From Swiss-Prot:
GO MF entries: [protein-PII] uridylyltransferase activity; phosphoric diester hydrolase activity
InterPro entries: ACT-like_dom_sf, ACT_dom, HD/PDEase_dom, HD_domain, NT_sf, PII_UdlTrfase/GS_AdlTrfase, Polymerase_NTP_transf_dom, UTase/UR
Lineage, top ranks: Bacteria, Pseudomonadati, Pseudomonadota, Gammaproteobacteria, Vibrionales
Ranges for domain ACT: 693-777, 800-874
Record organism: Vibrio parahaemolyticus serotype O3:K6 (strain RIMD 2210633)
Gene responsible for this protein: glnD
Hydrolase is among the record's keywords: yes
Uridylyl-removing: region residues: 333-692
Task performed by this protein: Modifies, by uridylylation and deuridylylation, the PII regulatory proteins (GlnB and homologs), in response to the nitrogen status of the cell that GlnD senses through the glutamine level. Under low glutamine levels, catalyzes the conversion of the PII proteins and UTP to PII-UMP and PPi, while under higher glutamine levels, GlnD hydrolyzes PII-UMP to PII and UMP (deuridylylation). Thus, controls uridylylation state and activity of the PII proteins, and plays an important role in the regulation of nitrogen assimilation and metabolism.
CDD domains named in the record: ACT_ACR-UUR-like_2 (cd04899), ACT_UUR-like_1 (cd04900), HDc (cd00077), NT_GlnE_GlnD_like (cd05401)
Protein name: Bifunctional uridylyltransferase/uridylyl-removing enzyme
Length: 874
């Protein structure tokens, strides 16, 4: 049935019930048309037109047409004639003089009806003079009035308003421009000045619709241009820039429309909760999260294009219009470039098209000259044109390859040149592989940035290793990097480390081959190319080994050292690893990770220097730890006999897996105990290995691990490592490395309460109830399949279990309870949280003390998957 025009609604139809039905019918029709691929521009304009007709009819119904000198005016986005399904409908009831009380009451009825219809109406009732006064003081009001459009009522009253708004005294063009630039700067700062936010706001994020609006507002104020097309006619945009902005706006409108038809309340944020459905509405499909990632890739690329155009056009406007073309004197840099103020500019109008390799010369100048802060607007426009007209990638030009390698070797390029090259599209113009990762996101909570943005941040983090002020944060890297002979090898590895993502298959393997080929093409030796390729292939090796393997097992160190081969590779790898972690998510790096990587680095360094054919003597390490710990204990007044009697109860593994200071600390408290049958809980006052050590000594009891981690979870602490041991006389000697919610050591003010509550549950001697908490909303939109794998343990008496699951509340306690239910002994745990994923390693033995049989492994796998699947769906 065709839609009825609101203008034809009878008085009888004007009631909340029937009007709601008509609005729902219109919205439903628009939704279906959108899903059937009707042009979004026509839908956005049609919605505004429908509201025009509805408001006009209601204006008539309330009898306002019979009242002289009042007008109904659309302002803001509605004034532009643009409405999305949940857009605000901003209206102004305009009059020449203050309205009588009775008329104000009737207008209030009119507005109330609109609200009752669930329309997002923003309104003001003002005289022309009030609009002028408020508009002069309020930039937002002034901007809205600039887009005012008469819906119905007095034309004369509306024209009186337009006369005020268009006058130079209302908001002079330059004043308006400066205010809008500051407003945009503040808005961008709220989004951390990046287009790459995980849950971006379609409207307000840098590169979003507001950046297009800002261009329109500035041009409208100066030229009177009312559309993007008129902006191009005034010469504010070239034809190509006009077409690009229209294309970008169309895409952003489609994303916004697709979002709004899924929401009940106004929102422009592409949250995780809605990204999948929006992608489906837009026709992006693929296995798993592929559809979302494809949509977000195009979305981020669009934001980059808008942000680049916005910045360039506003600078051009400032230079050519506001400053009347006045410029500073230029300082000639060479035959091709000059510096004007803090900006570099090309000296010839078609330089980049005639000799594309000079694009890289420009960035070498930027790296060389600390006073250059950016590229002049005309040169930026020339660069954009040349970039689009390139018929081959820049790396195919021999002269360009020399210059790119020179940038990789330049000490200042990491700080200045590469990020600007990326932002201006030069990295993508140079490397075809880079162009494929631009805007490539990963639908998870771990990667805070797109692949390209992450890679640029990685380069910047490498540069921080040159600064002595960062030595406390990155001691190993700050020692290694400044003396590294061929830093360019690390830089190239950083550029390529994630370049294979988004293409299917193992991105490390893809990147290895491409990095090797790149090095050979750029004139590096085969050994250098092999090292770079190896770094790309194994860029996750050190992080995984440190966080998810038992690095106190000499066999683990030997195996890692075999893969690394030599100290040079180890030094390159640790720098790449640390920078990679820091550039993945600002919240990832902490003292715990720093300590783990340092322990792995130094253990491997010792193994390489000793020679892999000379493995560590375990018995010698135990003797060393005992001698050092004994000396500390004797200083505290304990006799050799007391120490010997206590240590006779301990197994050798205890002395192997703890430092001598830990052993002395534990044993001093154990020797002072009045009743050795009571539980002992200790908490380290100083951070140990970057975290807080919680030591537990008590008689063995069922599900002890689950009891301890459940109690720590109750206090919102996270266990990252656990050493689970039993003495020869049936006591447990457990050590837990714990961090708070912010990845820091536990504040000392909380120690007493933790000791008290842990002691209480241990004295109770029964498994504590696991605290049930609702899965956080942000986790509910991720599907992490529970996965249990058993790793080969040749020659070992234990079984290694790798475990992946959604990081739900109480997860670790549930896993520990499952071990207890199946009479499986836990000897150690490495706990790693990667965004929404828990990726843990457990060291297990059977009740009899040996490796788990295949039957036991299968039973454990089935039980864990069953229990955790129930927990997620509960």
């Amino acid at each position: 049935m065709p839609l009825q025009s609101p203008l034809t609604f009878s008085d009888e139809q004007i009631n909340i019930g029937e009007l709601k039905q008509e609005l729902e019918k219109f919205s439903s029709t628009q939704k279906q048309e959108f899903l059937n691929h009707h042009p979004v521009t026509s839908l956005v304009l049609a919605r505004a037109e429908y509201m025009d007709l509805l408001l006009t009819r209601l204006w008539q119904y309330f009898g306002f047409n019979d009242i002289y000198n009042i007008s109904l005016v659309a302002v803001g986005g509605y004034g532009r004639g643009e409405l999305h399904p949940l857009s605000d409908i901003d209206i102004l009831v305009l009059s020449n003089n203050k309205l009588p009380t009775a008329l104000e009451a009737k207008i209030s009825e009119f507005i109330t009806l609109l609200w009752d219809l669930k329309l997002e109406v923003g309104h003001a009732v003002r005289t022309v003079n009030e609009c002028a006064q408020i508009g002069r003081d309020d930039l937002t009001v002034a901007t809205n009035l600039q887009e005012a459009r008469l819906l119905c009522g007095s034309e004369d009253t509306f024209q009186a308003l337009k006369k005020v708004v268009l006058s130079d005294s209302f908001w002079p063009s330059e004043t308006f421009y400066r205010a809008k630039i500051q407003e945009q700067r503040e808005r961008h700062a709220r989004y951390h000045d990046t287009t790459y936010n995980l849950e971006p706001d379609i409207k307000s994020t840098p590169g979003g619709l507001r950046d297009i609006h800002t261009l329109s507002w500035v041009a409208r104020r100066h030229f009177g241009a009312t559309s993007l097309l008129e902006m191009s006619r005034y010469g504010f945009l070239t034809d190509a820039e006009y077409r690009e902005l229209v294309e970008c706006q169309d895409f952003l409108w489609r994303v916004r429309f697709a979002l709004h038809i899924e929401l009940r309340r106004y929102d422009n944020r592409l949250t995780f909760a809605h990204q999948a459905q929006v992608a489906e509405n837009l026709g992006y499909v693929g296995e798993g999260n592929r559809g979302v990632e494809m949509m977000m890739k195009e979305f981020y690329r669009t934001l980059r294009r808008v942000a680049e155009l916005n910045k360039m056009l506003l600078k051009l406007f400032d230079q050519a219009i506001i400053n009347g073309g006045a410029t500073e004197n230029a300082e000639i840099l060479d035959a091709d470039f000059q510096r004007r103020g803090s900006l570099i500019e090309a000296r010839k109008p078609a330089l980049f098209q005639a000799r594309p390799e000079t694009i890289l010369d420009m960035f070498l100048h930027i790296a060389n000259d600390s006073t250059i802060e950016g590229v002049s607007p005309p040169t930026l426009r020339q660069l954009r044109t040349a970039r689009r007209r390139l018929n081959k990638f820049l790396h195919t030009i021999p002269a360009a390859r020399e210059k790119f390698l020179a940038l990789c070797r330049h000490p200042n390029a990491l700080h200045k040149a590469f990020s600007l090259m990326h932002r201006l599209g030069v990295m993508a113009a140079y490397l075809p592989q880079w162009s494929q990762i631009v805007g490539q996101m990963q639908f998870d909570l771990f990667h805070a940035y797109t692949v390209d943005e992450h890679s640029i941040r990685l380069l910047k983090h490498i540069n921080t290793f040159n600064n002595p002020d960062n030595h406390a944060k990155h001691p190993i890297c700050c020692d290694i990097y400044p003396r590294m002979q061929k830093k360019e090898l690390l830089i190239i590895a950083a550029i390529f480390h994630d370049i294979g993502k988004g293409r299917g298959g193992d991105h490390s393997v893809i990147g290895e081959g491409e990095a090797y080929d790149f090095c050979i093409e750029h004139g590096l030796s085969k050994p250098e190319a092999k090292l770079v390729g190896w770094l790309v292939r194994h860029h996750l090796l050190m992080s995984v080994t440190a966080q998810r393997r038992d690095i106190y097992d000499p066999d683990v160190i030997t195996e890692f050292a075999k893969q690394v081969r030599d100290e040079e590779s180890l030094e390159y790898l640790v720098c790449l690893t640390v920078a990679d972690i820091c550039a993945t998510n600002p919240e990832l790096w902490n003292a715990w990770k720093r300590t783990l990587l340092a322990e792995l680095f130094y253990s491997t360094q010792r193994a390489l220097r000793r020679g892999l054919e000379n493995p560590v003597d375990v018995r010698e390490r135990i003797r060393h730890n005992q001698q050092m710990a004994s000396a500390l204990l004797r200083k505290e007044g304990f006799s050799a006999r007391q120490i010997e009697v206590l240590w006779q109860r301990f197994k050798a593994d205890y002395f192997l897996r703890h430092t001598h200071t830990q052993i002395a600390w534990h044993c001093a408290h154990l020797l002072r105990m009045d009743d050795p049958n009571k539980p002992l809980v200790l908490i380290s006052k100083k951070a140990t290995r970057g975290g807080t050590e919680v030591f537990v000594y008590t008689k063995d009891q069922p599900a002890l691990f689950a009891t301890v981690v459940a109690e720590l979870d109750r206090r919102n602490f996270n266990v990252h490592d656990a050493q689970i041991m039993t003495s020869k006389d049936g006591h447990v000697i457990d050590t837990f490395m714990v961090l708070d919610q912010h990845g820091e050591a536990i504040d000392e003010s909380r120690h007493a309460a933790v000791i008290k509550h842990l002691t209480h549950v241990l004295e109770a001697g029964r498994p504590t109830k696991i605290k049930t908490r609702r899965t956080p909303n942000k986790l509910q939109h991720f599907n992490v399949k529970t996965k249990v794998d058993f790793l080969p343990t040749k020659g070992k008496k234990h079984t290694l279990m790798e475990f992946v699951a959604l990081d739900t509340p109480g997860l670790l306690a549930k896993v520990g309870r499952t071990f207890a239910d199946l009479n499986i002994n836990l000897h150690g745990a490495k706990i790693t949280t990667i965004g929404e994923r828990a990726e843990d390693l457990f060291i297990l033995t059977s009740e009899a003390g040996g490796r788990l049989s295949e039957e036991q492994q299968n039973e454990l796998r089935d039980k864990l998957i069953e229990k955790l699947s129930d927990a997620v769906t509960a």
